[in-house]
């Protein structure tokens, strides 16, 4: 298991995706040193890490995101687990009260900064609704295609930070795509609260990866 650091805001998309893919290529390039089977790679993360994991898995056929070093290695993965991660930046405010939707309808919202980068001086930036193509390109839902690896999606039905609708949309899109996908909704769980650190939840994720990555 490897924990990966990646660039976040003020660095704009696709910086974090390029970092995630380069980390995979680095590990594969050093597979013998680390005792890794580079034909059996899984990615997982929660929140922003879940978003990044989904982006890595859904863009496997898009070499434009493979930048930097170790380009003779593939950044493809064989399994993906996303835990309460965003999947569609265009609808990220769905399922929230009006006051929360007002925050997302802002040039300073985190998802707008991810797509636009930090703005300076007279540049006001853009609402995501003004740049739907860019928002779609920075969303896992914008990259669904045949041949994706198996997915495990997990979300709490009491999440106050990332709406469960985000995982609903991803699950529906993957099902329509014919992708093997499992969707687990954790009752009463909020965003990253103690529900997620229960041993049965941890065991569930470990067993899922074991079942999908064992030879």
Over which residues does each language-model region extend?
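Alpha/beta-hydrolase superfamily serine-hydrolase fold, recognizing
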Residues: 1-215
């Amino acid at each position: 298991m490897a924990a990966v650091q990646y660039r976040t805001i003020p660095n704009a998309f696709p910086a974090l995706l390029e970092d995630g893919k380069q980390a995979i290529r680095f590990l594969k390039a050093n597979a013998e040193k680390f005792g890794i089977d580079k034909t059996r790679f899984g990615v997982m993360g929660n929140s922003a890490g879940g978003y990044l994991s989904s982006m890595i898995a859904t863009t496997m056929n898009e070499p434009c995101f493979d930048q930097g070093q170790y380009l003779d290695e593939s950044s493809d993965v064989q399994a993906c687990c996303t835990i309460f991660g965003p999947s569609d930046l265009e609808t990220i405010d769905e399922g929230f009260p009006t006051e929360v939707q007002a925050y997302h309808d802002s040039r300073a919202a985190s998802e707008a900064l991810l797509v636009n980068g930090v703005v300076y001086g007279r540049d006001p930036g853009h609402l995501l609704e003004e740049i739907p193509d860019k928002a779609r390109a920075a969303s896992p839902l914008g990259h669904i295609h045949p041949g994706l690896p198996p997915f495990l999606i997990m979300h709490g039905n009491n999440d106050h930070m990332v709406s469960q609708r985000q995982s609903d949309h991803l699950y529906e899109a993957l099902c329509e795509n014919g992708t093997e996908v499992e969707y687990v909704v954790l009752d009463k769980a909020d965003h990253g609260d103690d529900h997620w650190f229960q041993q049965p939840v941890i065991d569930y994720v470990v067993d899922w990866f074991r079942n999908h990555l064992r030879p």
